[in-house]
Curated annotation (Swiss-Prot):
UniProt record similarity statement: Belongs to the Wnt family.
PTM per Swiss-Prot/TrEMBL: Palmitoleoylation is required for efficient binding to frizzled receptors. Depalmitoleoylation leads to Wnt signaling pathway inhibition.
Disulfide cross-links: 89-104
Gene name tied to this protein: WNT-3B
GO molecular function: cytokine activity; frizzled binding
Protein name (Swiss-Prot/TrEMBL): Protein Wnt-3b
């Protein structure tokens, strides 16, 4: 009579919100880099260097960039962006749908609407 014991281990994916928050933190603290070209024995070599020396240098786990994002506030046919002018925003939101962010500092107009709609309610 023998007994068997099985042990199974697996990795579980973290909650989607946790991953999103982590990536947003990385994005918000990304380091701007510059490309430097220098000559070595094997030819020209390009390396990345932090643009601002007064900040701590990025680690291997930090997010870095060397090109700025396009201006999404204004229309850009090249990127297919329509810009944010005349978009509906949420005055009370501090998120991506909020007027502060979506209106790009241009200000916004507040409009109050009163609607009458048939709701097909059953009481």
């Amino acid at each position: 009579s023998g007994s068997c014991e099985v042990k199974t281990c697996w990795w579980a994916q973290p909650d989607f919100r946790v991953i999103g928050d982590y990536l947003k933190d990385k994005y918000d603290s990304a380091s701007e880099m510059v490309v430097e070209k220098h000559r070595e024995s094997r030819g020209w070599v390009e390396t990345l260097r932090a643009k601002y020396e007064l900040f701590k240098p990025p680690t291997e786990r930090d997010l870095v960039y060397y090109e700025n994002s396009p201006n999404f506030c204004e229309p850009n046919a090249e990127t297919g962006s329509f810009g944010t002018r005349d978009r509906i925003c949420n005055v009370t939101s501090h998120g991506i749908d909020g007027c502060d962010l979506l209106c790009c500092g241009r200000g916004h107009n507040t409009r109050t609407e009163k609607r009458k709609e048939k709701c097909h309610c059953i009481f």
